[in-house]
Amino acid sequence: MAKVTAGRDELGQFAPKFAELNDDVLFGEVWSREDKLSARDRSIVTVTALTASGILDSSLKFHIQNAKNHGVTAEEMSEILTHAAFYCGWPKAWAALRMAKEVYA
């Protein structure tokens, strides 16, 4: 996985420790443990967790794109979010599916 610098780019001046943890720990360490869980599977977990939490903003779109980049197909993403709808709520899944439709267009 390519080095992530979004934390430093977006929040480095305002919240340097948060930016460091985002870039170096979350993306630098956790996401790089592919011997434990593949980046593809981490992407699926992340998209599902964000949807269930109601985080339906640019971060969800980023992670849907990330899932696509890690090999999750449009058909799989549709099924993942349809399945999640029954556990996280129909409106959240609806919003996530619309976002996924844009990403996979």
Regions found by a protein language model. Give the residues of each.
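Aromatic side chains
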Residues: F27, H63, F86-Y87
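Extended intrinsically disordered, low-complexity coil regions enriched in Ser, Thr, Gly, Ala
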Residues: L56-S78, T82, K92-Y104
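Acidic, glycine/proline-rich low-complexity segments that act as flexible tails and inter-domain linkers
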Residues: M1-D41, A52, N69, A93-A105
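Short, structured motif recognition centered on aromatic/hydrophobic residues
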Residues: D41-L50, L60, I80-L81
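Short alpha-helix boundary/capping elements
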Residues: A49-L56, A85-G89
